[in-house]
């Protein structure tokens, strides 16, 4: 009997690496947009700088991951998706 409450160890097991890379890129783009929006809407210069630093760190992380390294791509997708969820849920209040 299969336990359906646990996600598969690799949700991308039957997905080509090129598609995983596309998901990686789209997730990074979504998170960059959220960070950029918060930077533009910041109440202070310090807060704006903090969000902009996150934009730059994300850019650097995105550039550092080789397009063929599935493990790193998937790890970043998962990490960034959690951050996106946290930011979006904080918007909803």
Language model features with spans:
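Short, charged, amphipathic alpha-helical segments
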Residues: 45-56, 71-78
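Long amphipathic alpha-helices with heptad-repeat character
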Residues: 21-24, 70, 77, 84
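Amphipathic coiled-coil alpha-helices
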Residues: 27-28, 35, 51-52, 58, ...
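Short, charged, intrinsically disordered terminal tails
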Residues: 2-14, 75-93
